Amino acid sequence: MTRKYIYIYIYIILKVRARVGANNKTLINNQSHLIEMRNTLMLSDLPGDLLEEILCRVPATSLKQLRSTCKQWNNLFNNGRFTRKHLDKAPKDFQNLMLSDSRVFSMSVSFHGIPSVEATCELSLIDSFSSFEDKFEISQVFHCDGLLLCTDADNTRIVVWNPCTGKTRWIEPNNRCYYYAFGSYLDKSYGNSYKILSYSGYGYENQELAIYEINSQSWRFLDVTRDCILERYTDYGVSLKGHTYWFASDEKEKNLSVFLVSFDYTTERFRRLRLPYQCPDYNTASLSVVREEKLAVLLQRENTSRTEIWVTSRIGETKVVSWSMVLAVDFPSELFILSGISFLVDAEKKFVVCCDNYFGEDEYDTKNLVHIVGENNKVREVNFGVSESSWPFLFNYVPSLIQIWEGVGGKRKRVE
């Protein structure tokens, strides 16, 4: 890269920092040097491929601030090929989100000094079909590539939402399957694309499966041979590198160990993945994702308070997946960990953040709780207030510019 383009790169980075609130004094000093350069050098001088290489390495949350400053950049940010390239190359802005009382909140988690967690802001999803622009009440949420698949409590409304760009796509629901997952695959015609998998429930044989293809905008039933049953330790699977993962058990041999099963949206097939150790059942089991690279499981066997958090090797790098235990804690007896718990883990700092729901003696005495637990078994509890609707759900999120609302034709069809 020539010095000329290095200066342009510096200019772009400074512009990004200015838009996201960098120190004004520093910017003034830097901009005094750039003013003269800008008089003789315009962004139009920058070759398109080099501009892409620069911008695809700037975090999505920073790029969205620049959308309105340059028509050329705005067109680029709307280009599907660029947004996919950006997803692959841009630094990951890892965030923690929580679904609580039908709303999604951004969470700040700190392990320095006294561990703390707090909701910093609400990510508002406006109901496009409401005359008064009411907020959409979310019952389930599923994350993949910076997109959130959200459903309502009655499973009559489905929307794919990008909180970073604010764009949405509303989808006709499947009337026969009430649980949903979301993943990506490589389409020969469209490139990277997305599908929604719906299934009829947990814990029994002959679970119906249906697929919604974003490109064709239609549902179809999935005729696939399975030898396992999806187990309801939690209402949510997790997405990692386009695949969805759940807990499962053998369809014929019910006494065999519980395992993980993944769904590949390209081949539309299931594949088994062994857990760290064999166990026919767990008191508590939950899945999470670590930095968009690894799977994590929280496992608590029956009749014990010992809870273990295991993390895999990087998914996709080798055919064989290995497990490492990063944390083992004995939860206090007064902390009753339920199967519906969701969690995040910091493998380096040896902390786990759990989110569940407390039920009091009064049917209206319910509240959402977040627990921070470290190697010393000390539990810090944060009360997030009275819960009136959905079970709280804590999950990882990485903002992106990915969009699925342009250039896809096809007539919308409904599964009856």
Swiss-Prot record:
Positions of the F-box domain: 40-86
Which Gene3D superfamilies has this protein been placed in? 1.20.1280.50
* SUPFAM superfamilies recorded: F-box domain, Galactose oxidase, central domain
User: InterPro entries this protein is in?
Assistant: F-box-assoc_dom_typ1, F-box-assoc_interact_dom, F-box-like_dom_sf, F-box_dom, Gal_Oxase/kelch_b-propeller, SCF_F-box_component
CDD domains annotated for this entry?
F-box_AtFBW1-like
Q: Which Pfam families match?
A: F-box, FBA_1
This protein's name? Probable F-box protein At5g47300
Q: Which organism is it from?
A: Arabidopsis thaliana (Mouse-ear cress)
